[in-house]
Amino acid sequence: MSTRYDCRDSQSRIAGVDAAVTAARAGELIVLPTDTVYGIGADAFIPAAVTTMLAAKGRGRNMPPPVLVGTARAAAALVDDLGAFGQELIDEFWPGALTLVFRASPTLLWDLGETRGTVALRMPLHPVALDVLKQTGPLAVSSANRTGQPAPTTADEAQQQLGEAVSVYLDGGPCADSVPSTILDLTGTSPTLLRAGAISVDRLRTVASVIADDEHLVPSPDPADFKPAAPHPLEGGGARADAPTDEGPSGS
């Protein structure tokens, strides 16, 4: 049975965050607000939980979720190399609406799906999300919608779509900004813009002066899922990830 907490009330927020942390650690699904849309989350290091999350959304392993972190230090532990601009971009834009795609550390014991060795990371600018993430550690988070449906900007919309598949709903009120996160791929020789979003290219170029636009770049209404394409750098071949589909790459 699902439980919902109104995080606009301080006592309910404390209870809700505690319940969400307990649920995530037990391999259950949670819904939490972010600075873009509501996300459905699972412990990134419990493969069965990630599989359950994808099933709740009605999608397969070919569209792996991104990972949200509560601190920049947590992100550094998940990647093989931050690259030439990774740390500078993190310092300037996190927490915030910038999703960065890195080569994942080969030592990680997780299974997010068909990532081809990459991971899309973001640190959201939302106090409730950060309260949860600082206790759970990295969460696999996708927009809290069924595939093909609009990404929810309220807890009501998320609950209408996901129902009892989720153990804990954290209601933080309407999301402040429904514009999806900008997605930047740092796995190649130079940063590549995969999706235009809340942070403009001009702002990004104040930190990383050389940014290429992906040839298939398209806007996406759903800020929540990262879909890599073949060939991937770790398999030889070009250093690019696929552009967003209508379901969108991620960052919630």
Set out the residue ranges of the language-model regions.
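Active-site-adjacent structural elements in enzyme catalytic cores
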Residues: 1-252
